[in-house]
A protein has these predicted regions:
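Alpha-helical secondary-structure segments
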Residues: 116-117, 121, 138-140, 201-202, ...
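Surface-exposed binding/hinge segments that line
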Residues: 97, 101, 124-164, 173-180
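Acidic-aromatic pocket-rim loops
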Residues: 2, 363-402
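N-terminal lobe/hinge region of extracytoplasmic solute-binding protein
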Residues: 42-93, 169
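Long beta-strand-rich cores associated with HINT superfamily self-processing modules
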Residues: 432-458
Length: 458
């Protein structure tokens, strides 16, 4: 009897262990990455061209550039320079001459080899002031002035390496199979990509889709990744959407069409800056999902953002307005398709009126002031400040390194001119379907699709 009871316990334990093992195997099988499937992305952004060097720059252009093309180096999440098409580099002449050694065995999507001649041609076109020399597997770049952190600049999307001809060819993990400017792009995964084939078979991108249409197709299961407007992120989270967001990495700024022509005009701009309640904008319009900004670069990048006050000072704004005397009405322009820009512009008008300033919105391209949004890059302080100046049509700063003190001084000097008034740093937010696994974005909103795979469908 005792023996039968012991056997019964042994059998029960064996069954329990077998059940646990089977469950573990099933779970492992269910979560193990698998190849196949097409990732469907919908966005409100549009592109007329996939050429990385075309203006205007945008987060969408940068993300597509990373899928189709490569740069000589990349910047990781910690701001460190990592090899990409180049596996080593060195400098001489105190940072005025740089030499890069190309990796071997890299091919374009048509199977042709990457050569130093092709690399040099791409860099010359993107940077006419550089002297670029190719020899063997070496690419040498001679600059007009020394730049100690020059490789960071080569990580920018506009310096992606491509071969131009009847079509643009790249060395990235995907190749373009269909392209309808401003509407649709279809990419296919490359089996011969140097870092190994991605799990996805392809990516389908639908452009120019309003937020409401994106939400509908997402809820119907027809889209995997959609935009979420910064001011809608809290609501989307409350509705149970799965969200992925970046650090505050898009600058919303007031940009004046010209420099202040007199001290009176500078005082009026100072009064406008003092009147705007940025913290209230962030709290009410963004529900604290962004950051009030008085600096061009975000604090997470520089560490010095707190040195610029974003608080409103209506008393000081009124005083400056009185000192300035008679003033004309400013015309404020913005992108009419940008719902957030519209409500921010309305808030600016109210704040300005409280300070005695006259501002009216306009859809004209010749506005006195424009409310614009500029995506930031994950490079370094010096490079990013130079890129911001370029995006705003302002002569780039001449800094040889990303020393924080020198970057702060350059930014502070520029902000004192009141050519621009920073308002907010925004996050890039995406809605992700349950079938998308391992989706992640960088601090600047860049997609990382190398490990992305799809569950539940092909």
């Amino acid at each position: 009897m005792q023996r039968q009871e012991n056997m019964r316990h042994i059998c029960l334990r064996w069954l329990a262990a077998s059940s646990l093992l089977l469950a573990a195997m099933c779970t492992s099988a269910a979560t193990r990455p698998r190849y196949g499937g097409t990732l469907r992305i919908s966005t409100s952004a549009v592109l007329n061209s996939i050429d990385p060097g075309e203006a205007p720059d945008s987060l969408l252009r940068r993300n597509l550039t990373r899928l189709l093309f490569d740069t000589l180096v990349v910047v990781d999440e910690n701001g460190a320079i990592q090899p990409s098409l180049a596996d080593s580099w060195n400098s001489s002449s105190a940072g005025q001459r740089w030499q890069f050694t190309l990796r071997h065995g890299i091919t374009f999507s048509d199977g042709s080899a990457l050569t130093s001649d092709v690399v040099a041609a791409a860099l010359r076109k993107a940077n006419p002031t550089w002297r670029v020399i190719s020899q063997g597997d070496l690419v040498t770049i001679e600059l007009e002035t020394a730049v100690l952190d020059f490789p960071a600049e080569l990580s920018l999307s506009r310096n992606a390496i491509l071969r131009r001809g009847d079509k643009l060819l790249g060395t990235g993990p995907f190749v373009m199979s269909q392209w309808e400017p401003r509407h649709r792009l279809v990419l296919a995964a490359r089996d011969d990509y140097r870092d190994g084939r991605v799990f996805l078979d392809g990516i389908e991108l639908e452009m120019g889709k309003p937020q409401r249409e994106q939400n509908i197709t997402f809820d119907l299961g027809r889209t995997d990744v959609i935009d979420i407007a910064p001011d809608q992120a809290r609501r989307a989270a409350g509705e149970g959407r799965r969200l992925v967001n970046s650090s505050p990495s898009e600058l919303m700024v007031l940009w004046f069409a010209r420099d202040a022509q007199s001290e009176v005009e500078r005082k009026l701009r100072e009064a406008l800056a003092m009147s705007i309640d940025r913290p209230l904008m962030n709290r009410v319009l963004l529900q604290n999902d962004g950051e009030a900004a008085a600096s061009l670069l975000p604090t997470w990048m520089t560490g010095y953002g707190f040195a610029f006050s974003a608080d409103a000072n209506q008393a000081r704004a009124k005083q400056l307005r009185t000192e300035a005397g008679p003033a004309r009405t400013w015309a404020l322009g913005y992108d009419n398709d940008d719902a957030l820009a519209r409500v921010v512009a309305e808030r600016i008008l109210l704040n300005a009126r409280d300070a005695g300033l006259s501002v009216q919105t306009t859809l004209s391209a010749s506005a006195d002031i424009r409310l614009i949004r500029i995506p930031l890059t994950l490079t370094n302080e010096r490079t990013e400040l130079s890129e911001l100046f370029s995006a705003m049509g302002i002569s780039p700063i001449k800094l040889s390194s990303s020393n924080v003190e020198s970057v702060y001084s350059a930014e502070n000097t520029f902000l004192q001119s009141r050519r621009v008034i920073p308002l907010l740093h925004l996050r890039h937010v995406s809605g992700i379907s349950a079938s998308v696994q391992n989706w992640s974005v960088g601090r600047d909103g860049s997609w990382d699709v190398q490990e992305v795979w799809l569950s539940g469908r092909q």
